[in-house]
């Protein structure tokens, strides 16, 4: 059975790169009816926090990436790592290193001055006796030959063993190192495939040798391409890439972000929009590219707008509620008629790219009054238009059935009686009702806003003019 894992370090929030790695592992597990395991790699105690662990888990849940086992925490397994490290030491596959951090740094600086790679010089490797000094445990790398990583994405990648230093597996304070913990955990958790960013590729030969030294078979490795900004620089906040939960708070749909992340390095023909079921069905590592993926914030925004169009109004109603409350358009605990709200959303969703934009647009259906944009006010609320607004108001007030058809008839009657163009009647009303010159059809806006709100808003502007 396929068993994969996502193993974030809780030294920050879950960002785009980590979320993409989590998604690829999740899709691979679901495609193969396997298991997806969540492991928290929290051995860096100085930087790992409970807040970040909670944030990562919240982001995973929001993305819908459910896990089958875990979350496991490395800090709960420290004695396990120590036991494996001492096993290697006893078998002569590792050795005690008595070099102090100061000595190591001094030699590193000297090597750099001489133009040599700043690697550990293995001076403690041949010390036979046990000294009464603090020590770290280093793994004995082979001194000759090559290590070939047969990567499922990159193909065969060869490393010279002589260029790989004897890495520390247990520090002098008794804490294990990343490369060692990963091997022990992946073996004990039965991981069959390690899918991770290509920045981990250089760790792979070290890990393979630790597997062999422990008498374990390494899993399959798949190193997925880096994500770059549109300027081909390493992805950062300046490219618009923020934490997963920031996208949630800005009004992105989780399905849209999942779709976007899936396409960062993986493709299926020219298809752009996938349901989760389709992603699970089509995903495989053969179609993960070798070239770096490019993060395009505009593309994500476009994709989100497409998802808003595709999402049923009933679901959008539930999703937009927190934004309406946050913006102050709806009070906590206040209820809206669902059918009415769905009509309002249907009229607006084609024009909105995020839930935040949708909530903002809904203000002119929910508030008694809206703020009018200065330029729109200057152009459409003046001595020429106020008489038209007054006549529209009088005729609308007389309507018994406040429907689009009846509203349209009133507008057309005024157009014909006064010899005006439709825009000369509709635009001033639109500006009063929405605060803007752009909106859904004006008859639809009035019908959804309702007679009371419409008249209240029109009379307020007329009285103030």
UniProtKB/Swiss-Prot annotation:
Cofactor detail note: Binds 1 zinc ion per subunit.
The organism's place on the tree of life at top rank: Bacteria
* SUPFAM superfamilies on file: An anticodon-binding domain of class I aminoacyl-tRNA synthetases (SSF48163), Nucleotidylyl transferase (SSF52374)
The record's InterPro entries line, in alphabetical order, gives: aa-tRNA-synth_I_cd-bd, aa-tRNA-synth_I_codon-bd_sub2, aa-tRNA-synth_I_CS, aa_tRNA-synth_I_cd-bd_sf, Glu-tRNA-ligase_bac/mito, Glu-tRNA-synth_I_codon-bd_sub1, Glu/Gln-tRNA-synth, Glu/Gln-tRNA-synth_Ib_cat-dom
Q: Which residues bind Zn(2+)?
A: 97, 99, 124, 126
Q: Where in the cell is it found?
A: Cytoplasm
The record's CDD domains line, in alphabetical order, gives: GluRS_core
Name one molecular function that GO assigns to this entry. Answer: zinc ion binding
Quote a single Gene Ontology cellular component term: cytosol
- The residues that the entry says bind ATP are 237
Sorted keywords for this record are: Aminoacyl-tRNA synthetase, ATP-binding, Cytoplasm, Ligase, Metal-binding, Nucleotide-binding, Protein biosynthesis, Zinc
Q: Where is this motif: 'HIGH' region?
A: 8-18
Name the Pfam families on file: Anticodon_2 (PF19269), tRNA-synt_1c (PF00749)
**Which cofactor names does the annotation list?**
Zn(2+)
Keyword Ligase among UniProt keywords: yes
Q: Which GO terms describe its biological process?
A: glutamyl-tRNA aminoacylation
Kindly state the positions of the motif 'KMSKS' region in this protein: 234-238
Under Enzyme Commission nomenclature, its number is 6.1.1.17
Which protein family is named in the record?
A: Belongs to the class-I aminoacyl-tRNA synthetase family. Glutamate--tRNA ligase type 1 subfamily.
* Function comment: Catalyzes the attachment of glutamate to tRNA(Glu) in a two-step reaction: glutamate is first activated by ATP to form Glu-AMP and then transferred to the acceptor end of tRNA(Glu).
Q: Spell out the subunit comment.
A: Monomer.
Query: What is the protein name stated in its UniProt record?
Result: Glutamate--tRNA ligase
Source organism of the structure: Thermodesulfovibrio yellowstonii (strain ATCC 51303 / DSM 11347 / YP87)
- Gene name, Swiss-Prot/TrEMBL: gltX
């Amino acid at each position: 059975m396929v068993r994969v894992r996502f193993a974030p370090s809780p030294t920050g929030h879950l960002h785009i790169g980590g979320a993409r790695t989590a998604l690829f592992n999740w899709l691979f597990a679901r495609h193969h009816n396997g298991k997806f395991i969540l492991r928290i790699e929290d051995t860096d105690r100085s930087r790992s926090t409970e807040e970040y662990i909670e944030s990562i888990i919240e982001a995973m849940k929001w993305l819908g990436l459910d896990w089958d086992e875990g979350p496991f925490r490395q800090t709960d397994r420290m004695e396990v790592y120590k036991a494996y490290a001492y096993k290697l030491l006893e078998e002569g596959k590792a050795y005690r290193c008595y070099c102090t951090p100061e000595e190591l740094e001094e030699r590193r600086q000297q090597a750099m001055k001489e133009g040599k790679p700043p690697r550990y010089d293995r001076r403690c490797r041949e010390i036979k006796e046990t000294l009464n000094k603090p020590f770290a445990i280093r793994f004995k790398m082979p001194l000759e030959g090559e290590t070939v990583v047969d990567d499922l994405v990159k193909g065969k990648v060869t490393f010279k063993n002589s260029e790989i230093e004897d890495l520390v597996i247990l520090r002098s304070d008794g804490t294990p190192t990343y490369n060692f913990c990963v091997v022990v955990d992946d073996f004990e958790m039965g991981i069959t495939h390690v899918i991770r960013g290509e920045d981990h590729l250089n760790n792979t030969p070290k890990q393979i040798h630790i597997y062999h030294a422990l008498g374990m078979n390494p899993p399959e490795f798949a190193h997925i391409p880096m994500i770059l900004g549109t300027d081909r620089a390493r992805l950062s906040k300046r490219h618009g890439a923020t934490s997963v939960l920031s996208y949630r708070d800005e009004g992105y749909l989780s399905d849209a972000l999942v779709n976007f992340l899936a396409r960062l390095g993986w493709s299926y023909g020219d298809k752009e929009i996938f349901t989760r079921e389709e992603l699970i069905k089509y995903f495989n590592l053969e179609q993960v590219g070798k070239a770096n993926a490019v993060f395009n914030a505009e593309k994500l925004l476009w994709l989100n707008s497409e998802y808003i169009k595709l999402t049923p109004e009933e679901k959008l109603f539930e999703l937009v509620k927190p934004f309406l409350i946050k913006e102050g358009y709806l009070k906590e605990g206040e209820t809206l008629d669902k059918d009415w709200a769905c009509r309002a959303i249907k009229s607006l969703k084609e024009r909105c790219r995020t839930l935040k934009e949708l909530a903002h647009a809904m203000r002119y259906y929910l508030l008694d009054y809206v703020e009018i944009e200065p330029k729109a006010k200057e152009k459409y609320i003046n001595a020429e238009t106020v008489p038209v607004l007054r006549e529209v108001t009088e005729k609308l007030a007389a309507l018994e059935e406040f429907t689009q058809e009846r509203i349209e008839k009133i507008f057309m009657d005024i157009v014909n009686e006064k010899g005006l163009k439709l825009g000369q009647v509709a635009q001033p009303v639109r500006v009063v009702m929405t605060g803007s010159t752009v909106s859904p059809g004006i008859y639809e806006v009035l019908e959804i806003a309702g007679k009371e709100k419409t008249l209240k808003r029109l009379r307020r502007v007329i009285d103030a003019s």
